[in-house]
Amino acid sequence: YFKQAIELIDTLKSQVLSKELLDQISAQEKYIKNKRLLVFNEPILYNEQHNKILVDFKNIDTLYNFIYKVDDLQKFNHLKSDSLYFNYIKSQQPFQVLETALPNHGDYNNYTTEVLLPDFSQGYYVLVSSYEKNVTENTPSVRFNPFVVSDVFIVYKEFNENLELQLLNRKTGK
C-alpha cells in the first residue's frame, strides 16, 4: 500500500494545491520514505562461536556494523549513553567492520532479518550499527549494543543473609 500511496502523492504534487494540503502530502511522503533501524543482540555471547543479531529496518539497503573491543572492564561499564559511546569510538579504531546487504523490496515496509556475526574471543565489545558508512554524532540512526563474550555464567541465590554463588560453563553446564 505504501508504494501505491507514493504514486498517488506524486500525482497529487503535480497538481495545483493549497500550501496546507501540499504540506500534509509532503509530511505523509516523508513518513513513508523515512528510514528506520533497530538492532537487537544478546548481552552475553558464546566464546568462539557464531552469533547473530536481529535487525528491524525500513528503507535501508546496507547495514554497517563497527565492532570495538573494550579492554578495560571499568571503561566498558562506564559506557551508558550515546554521548559516552561517541566519545569512546572517536579515540578508537574498530576491531572489525562488517558490511551487510539487506533485502529491500522498494515497497517502504518494515522488515526483520538476522545477520550473522563472526566468532569472537572472550572479552568486552561494543557493536555500533548504522545505515551510514561514516558514523559521527550527526549520523541520524546509530545503534550502540554492548556485549560480553564468555563461556562463564554466574548463578546466585540468597538464603536469609547468606549469598551462594555458582560459576557455570554455559556450554557444558558444569
Predicted regions located by residue number:
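N-terminal, cleavable Sec-dependent signal peptides of secreted/periplasmic/extracellular proteins
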Residues: 1-174
